[in-house]
Amino acid sequence: MTNQLIYKGKAKDIYSTKDENVIRTVYKDQATMLNGARKEAIDGKGALNNQISSLIFEKLNKAGVVTHYIEQISKNEQLNKKVDIIPLEVVLRNVTAGSFSKRFGVEEGRVLETPIVEFYYKNDDLNDPFINDEHVKFLGIVNDEEIAYLKGETRRINELLKGWFAQIGLNLIDFKLEFGFDQEGTIILADELSPDNCRLWDKNGNHMDKDVFRRDLGNLTDVYQVVLEKLIAL
């Protein structure tokens, strides 16, 4: 059925289209933290996230990364390939920050000699726990070969993103990716890429991401607008 709500999320709603293999993603004017425990309506945030994510996905597509992104169709909407989402959050860390610093008792801002890839099990009831490769296999999420692919593709995407953000004066601290299986059973990059799931610091160490909301550091949309303008100029 066309225009039927398929999924209602914290930051995005997903609808069916005339093509059973294509979905319409609507970005919402809402910020959340602590797995949705804190919610706040923020006017204009959805449009900013959509435009930023669209720009980044377009660049990734051109760079040869296979993604779900098709096109942006309005300020807060885009068309995507329909995928079966893998219930993993794949996090890559270039610099210590956030939960990593808290978990291991290290200060924020320490550059990691080798970027670290982490897995988190996407399960709201369990608060998305940190898991390792063996847990991933035990849960039957993906196999060894697919784990290796997810890690390798995440590291490749990291090198691309780091380079692009460096060109506009931003340091990519860490980011979260989600992948899914397309209609042919191929793993492709899905979800979004925006300051909601990319931790970005400027040259002075100022937060240019969702931490502005998490830590009450200022106006979130003002910060996201700066990131968007920088990406447009790239």
Swiss-Prot record:
Class of this enzyme = ligase
The alphabetized UniProt keywords are: ATP-binding, Ligase, Nucleotide-binding, Purine biosynthesis
**GO biological process terms on file:** 'de novo' IMP biosynthetic process; cobalamin biosynthetic process
Give the matching Pfam families: SAICAR_synt
Q: Which cysteines are joined by disulfide bonds?
A: none
Catalytic reactions of this protein: 5-amino-1-(5-phospho-D-ribosyl)imidazole-4-carboxylate + L-aspartate + ATP = (2S)-2-[5-amino-1-(5-phospho-beta-D-ribosyl)imidazole-4-carboxamido]succinate + ADP + phosphate + 2 H(+)
- Tell me the SUPFAM superfamilies matching this sequence: SAICAR synthase-like
Q: In which pathway does it act?
A: Purine metabolism; IMP biosynthesis via de novo pathway; 5-amino-1-(5-phospho-D-ribosyl)imidazole-4-carboxamide from 5-amino-1-(5-phospho-D-ribosyl)imidazole-4-carboxylate: step 1/2
Question: EC number(s) in its UniProt entry?
Answer: 6.3.2.6
| MF (Gene Ontology) | ATP binding; phosphoribosylaminoimidazolesuccinocarboxamide synthase activity
In the record, the note on similarity to other proteins reads: Belongs to the SAICAR synthetase family.
The record's listing under NCBIfam families reads:
purC
Name it.
Phosphoribosylaminoimidazole-succinocarboxamide synthase
| Species the sequence originates in | Streptococcus pyogenes serotype M6 (strain ATCC BAA-946 / MGAS10394)
Gene that codes for this? purC
